[in-house]
Amino acid sequence: MKRSEIDRYVQDLLDFARARQFPLPPWTTWTPAQWARTGGEADEIRHCGLGWDVTDFGSGDFARVGLTLLTLRNGRPGRASGKDYCEKVMMVREGQVTPCHFHFAKMEDIINRGGGRLVIQLYNSTADDRLDEAGEVRVQVDGIARRLPAGGELVLAPGESVALPPRLYHAFWGQPSAGPVLVGEVSRVNDDARDNRFLQQLPRFPAIEEDEPRRFVLCTEYGRL
């Protein structure tokens, strides 16, 4: 992905969150120079992977397969002390797919915080980590039990949420013609290095072409300032 594209997508989420009256912390707009001047007082942000994350999952087509995320709070994977939860906010565009995956340990609530409608496709997993293409899926939607066939699609309107247990395959996208979606995630500690299982082997983070100076720092870049 080009740096200019990444910066534009970060700005899009900043603007969208503001329009949906979802204020974000001041550090989300810090420049690279501000980050370089900031010392150990911000180590929780650095060590716990808080911050910006823009990916096309190696597709080369962000509008079709991609996601813009901001991790607002998280614990440190593998630590017995500290926060044992995570919160993210995401901008999911119409028809923009986050590919099918599950988490080995993380349970998460996916929340439609405003905008359009979020479509989530669900499958159970087998013992060898494949799709269970026959088994009925059971989830809780805002505390109400729901049953779907394998590969069934759950549509969340603004204000609705679904609890996804570990090892439940899910893909999601914004419903076409309904507008982008501001999506929240509340979960156990997030560990992108070890806890993700994508159905198809995909790069989690993109290679970046530095076509212009960066305006924002991604959560993977703090050690390179």
PLM regions and their residue ranges:
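A short, N-terminal "cap"/entry segment at the start of jelly-roll beta-barrel domains
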Residues: M1-C86, R215-E221
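Glycine- and acidic-residue-biased ligand/ion/polar-headgroup-sensing regions
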Residues: R93-E94, K106-E108, N112-D128, E133-G135
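His/acidic/aromatic-lined binding-pocket segments of jelly-roll/cupin-type domains
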Residues: K88-M90, E108-N112, V119, E153-L154, ...
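Conserved metal-binding segment of the jelly-roll/cupin
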Residues: R93, A150-S177, V183-R188
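A short beta-loop-beta micro-motif enriched in histidine and acidic residues
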Residues: P77-C86, V97-D109, R113-G114
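Double-stranded beta-helix
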Residues: A127-R146, W173-L225
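Short helix/loop capping segments that flank catalytic or ligand/cofactor-binding pockets
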Residues: C100, Q121, F172-W173, R194
